[in-house]
């Protein structure tokens, strides 16, 4: 079973930096529907996409895990 990631901090960073997901998607080079699939764990971010997002959002290397690799806590 693949892990599900919690992208809530990434979403907050996108809104704080670009004001809208649409503006971020234009700079990032993906459609809003593609980003939505990634943020909802239907598709995964590739390593080059993570690097590009970090560059656009000015996320330091030491903080990448906080934005891209925090797993969701499953509720029972």
Predicted regions and their residues:
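Short basic helix-loop element that most often maps to the first helix and adjoining turn
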Residues: 7-27
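Short, basic-rich loop-to-helix N-cap that marks the start of a DNA-contacting helix
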Residues: 42-52
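Short, charged recognition helix plus adjacent turn
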Residues: 3-4, 12, 17, 55, ...
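Short, Lys/Arg-enriched anionic-surface-contact patches
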Residues: 1-5, 32
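The DNA-recognition helices of helix-turn-helix-type DNA-binding domains
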Residues: 31, 42-43, 71-72
């Amino acid at each position: 079973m693949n892990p599900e990631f919690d992208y809530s901090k990434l979403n907050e960073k996108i809104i704080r930096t670009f004001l809208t997901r649409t503006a971020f998607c234009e700079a990032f080079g993906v459609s809003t529907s593609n980003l939505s699939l990634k943020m909802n764990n239907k598709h995964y971010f590739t390593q080059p996409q993570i690097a590009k997002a970090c560059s656009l959002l000015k996320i330091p290397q030491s903080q990448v895990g906080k934005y891209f690799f925090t797993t969701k806590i499953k509720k029972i």
